[in-house]
Structure formats: structure tokens, C-alpha cells
Amino acid sequence: MNNLPLLNDLRVFMLVARRAGFAAVAEELGVSPAFVSKRIALLEQTLNVVLLHRTTRRVTITEEGERIYEWAQRILQDVGQMMDELSDVRQVPQGMLRIISSFGFGRQVVAPALLALAKAYPQLELRFDVEDRLVDLVNEGVDLDIRIGDDIAPNLIARKLATNYRILCASPEFIAQHGAPKHLTDLSALPCLVIKERDHPFGVWQLRNKEGPHAIKVTGPLSSNHGEIVHQWCLDGQGIALRSWWDVSENIASGHLVQVLPEYYQPANVWAVYVSRLATSAKVRITVEFLRQYFAEHYPNFSLEHA
């Protein structure tokens, strides 16, 4: 072996192995599929192994490729840790940080916070994606998941960024037409706007009050996987919605929405979630603390407190 593989080629290979194709990786990196194919070919030539089986429909990793993938993952993690330790010494976070969040919260709250972070720490390179699904942080190469909801796997590290609750709400027009529910069981007979949240099963609202937890099955003619769509339907008087306080507090203050069954709520705190190997990462630690302070300063009424 005359040459050592380039770190960037190892990164490209890992992405291709995860995505099982060149086109998706090319789109993610902002390059052509031909460029991705060339980098893989050069890496195979350098290592003198076949890393991938290529067909017209998909790309699969070879047995040798699986071993190289494991080595590449360790090498890149070690390089990342080295850069983090340098950042600790310099007290300046630097390098790539891939962050993910949900659509609505990501667009409205997280994106402006990351813009402020980028201005404060220009040596950080931030990659921000939005997905309304739980991601596999390890296998999808995500450093930090900014998520809403308290159901977090025990093998992950979670740092609380802000207190938040989901509440039941509807428009004044809806209340005038259907009446306000007086008991939790009334929701079963009313049109509800159902959304697939990342942290709860579809069509089952798991709520709490002073007496403890409650679960209610709800239905309605309209449902979506996008919170902003459900929010707009709620404003349009199409049903009762279960939405985060950060999302509807201004509408409630303005009278465009009203809270129903106010004694019931759903805990949905905001967390920064990452894998254990990043516990000592300077850029993760500084980013988490920055976001915590940002939310406290820019969203002082983030939460609806419950006794």
C-alpha cells in the first residue's frame, strides 16, 4: 500500500454505505454522483479491496467493506476527539456538527438559535436537518438531536434545554359550534386533529392531571404528520389539537385559540440528545449550553407551569 486513504474519502464511503447509493450522498454533499463514485474508486484502489457491490438499483457493502467501515468509524471518531481536545485547549469549538430536529420546532425555534450559534462560533460548521421521526444517531451519523418529548432511550445522553408542555386547544369558532368539552372522555365524540408525534403513538393522547396519567383514543376526519398543518387546521376551526405551548401560546394570548380542559397536559420538554462517545466533546458541550441559554433568553415564556 503506497498511500494512506484520505479522511474525506473514508467519510464519503461511510455515507454511501449508510445511504446504499451514490445519488443520495451526492445530494447531501452538494457534488455530482460521478464525483462520489470517483472518490470510492480511488479509496478502493488505495486499499486494494472492493468495498461495494454496484447494481443498477442499489449499492451494497462487501464483507471487506464492512471491516473497513468499522475501522473508518473508529478513525474518524478518534480524529473528531482529537479536534475536540484541541478545542478544549483553545476554548474555541470547531469542526462539523450535524444536528437534527423536528420540522416545526426546527424551523421556528432551533434554526434561529443555530444561526446565532454560528455567528458566535464561526469555526463551527453546522449541518442542520429536520425529520419528523426518531433517528438512529449512531448509524445515521447525527451528533445532536434537539427533540421534544421525555421518552429517551437509556443508552443516550440527554440534557434538558427547556420546560415545555402540550395542551389541548381549539378555535373560538369550533367551541361555538361544538361546545367545549367538560370531561376528558368528551374528546372521543369530538373531531380531533391527530398528528404523528416523534414520541407518542398515533391517535392516542397520553395526558396528565393532578390525579396522574390518562390515555384517551381520539379520532377525526383530518390527520397529518406535520405539526404546522395541524396548527393551521386548528386555527381554521376544524378540530381540537394537542400542541406544544411554545407553538400556540401567542395564538391563545391573541384569542385566536382557546385552551380546553386546562387541567390536562402532556409533558414535552426540550432535550439535547447525543451518544455517550460525545460526552467529552467540546463542541457538543458548548452547543448544548449555548442553546440552553438562548432558549432562556429568547423564550422566557417557553413553558406553561403546572403544579
UniProtKB/Swiss-Prot annotation:
One Pfam family matching this protein: HTH_1
Name of the protein in its database record: HTH-type transcriptional regulator DmlR
InterPro entries attached here? LysR_subst-bd, Tscrpt_reg_HTH_LysR, WH-like_DNA-bd_sf, WH_DNA-bd_sf
**Highest taxon in the source lineage:** Bacteria
Q: Which organism is it from?
A: Escherichia coli (strain K12)
What are the GO BP annotations of this UniProt entry?
Answer: DNA-templated transcription; malate metabolic process; negative regulation of DNA-templated transcription; positive regulation of DNA-templated transcription
For this chain, the family text in UniProt reads: Belongs to the LysR transcriptional regulatory family.
Induction of this protein: by what?
Answer: Expression of dmlR is subject to negative autoregulation under both aerobic and anaerobic growth conditions. Its level of expression is generally lower under anaerobic conditions than that under aerobic conditions.
Q: What cystine linkages occur within this chain?
A: none
Which intervals hold domain HTH lysR-type? 5-62
Keywords carried by this UniProt record? Activator, DNA-binding, Repressor, Transcription, Transcription regulation
